[in-house]
């Protein structure tokens, strides 16, 4: 929300949704398998796999579990028909929404995604309708830390930008392919991040009011509940004042 990192917002919103943890792990494993199948099992030469590993570790997945997933992908398995599909649409209040899916059945997936949009006052758009509003970036997040120290180390490691929020949280932005290398450099400097993920960063924000904010959150929850949906990105901005009413 305003003055807070996207990761902090998501973390606090999901804190009461521990029942979804198993589903989150399932989605991460699916991404690990697919990334390894498409680009090989070496994260050093497979940025998509490295990003998936970083996400797995940020969600406290064990090395044994993620290594088994990578081995499945390299060896080929029942997930061989999985493909990445991106859906674009508009949510409440004109919010731009991108939905990243991994699916073996396009018809099933698009039906579920379309249903979520229609139930929450939005509509599914055509390819390219909102994608131009987003840029794919690596985001390395710190709940707190010394801004100058993190900024100096991050920029020296090749980061593109460092943003500090009102609550003291810090986000380091990188080219998505370079996120793993920048995170390694930060850790080598003694700066351990709380989260690292590849995200779609919006170039503009859509302010949500007391009426549209709960509808947007419901849309996000409905989309995330779809088994085929891996990630949901949007440009909705919820102020602290509006958040306090939710």
Curated annotation (Swiss-Prot):
SUPFAM superfamilies documented for this protein: YebC-like
The organism's place on the tree of life at top rank: Bacteria
GO molecular function annotation: DNA binding
Record localization: Cytoplasm
Stored InterPro entries: Integrase-like_N, TACO1_YebC-like_2nd/3rd_dom, TACO1_YebC_N, Transcrip_reg_TACO1-like, Transcrip_reg_TACO1-like_dom3, YebC-like
Pfam family, one: Transcrip_reg
Alphabetic keyword roster: Cytoplasm, DNA-binding, Transcription, Transcription regulation
GO cellular component: cytosol
One GO term (biological process): regulation of DNA-templated transcription
NCBIfam families noted in UniProt: PRK00110.1, PRK12378.1, YebC/PmpR family DNA-binding transcriptional regulator
Family: Belongs to the TACO1 family.
Name of protein: Probable transcriptional regulatory protein ESA_01378
Organism of origin: Cronobacter sakazakii (strain ATCC BAA-894)
């Amino acid at each position: 929300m305003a003055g807070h990192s996207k990761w902090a917002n998501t973390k606090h919103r999901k804190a009461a949704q521990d029942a979804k943890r198993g589903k989150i792990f399932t989605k991460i494993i699916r991404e690990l398998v697919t990334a390894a199948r498409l680009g090989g099992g070496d994260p050093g030469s497979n940025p998509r796999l490295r990003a998936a590993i970083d996400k797995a570790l940020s969600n406290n997945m064990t090395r044994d579990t993620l290594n088994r997933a990578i081995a499945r992908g390299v060896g080929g398995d029942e997930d061989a028909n999985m493909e990445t599909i991106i859906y674009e649409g508009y949510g409440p209040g004109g919010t731009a929404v991108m939905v990243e899916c991994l699916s073996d059945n396009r018809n099933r997936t698009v039906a579920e995604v379309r249903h979520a949009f229609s139930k929450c006052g939005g509509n599914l758009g055509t390819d390219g309708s909102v994608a131009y509003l987003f840029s794919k970036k690596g985001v390395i997040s710190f709940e707190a830390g010394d801004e100058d120290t993190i900024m100096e180390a991050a920029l020296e490691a090749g980061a593109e930008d460092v943003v500090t929020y009102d609550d003291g949280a810090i986000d380091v932005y990188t080219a998505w392919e370079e996120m793993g290398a920048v995170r390694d450099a930060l850790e080598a400097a003694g700066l351990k991040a709380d989260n690292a993920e590849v995200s779609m960063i919006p170039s503009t924000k859509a302010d949500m009011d007391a009426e549209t904010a709960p509808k947007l959150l419901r849309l996000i929850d409905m989309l995330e509940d779809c088994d085929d949906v891996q990630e949901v990105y949007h440009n909705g901005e919820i102020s602290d004042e509006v958040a306090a009413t939710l």
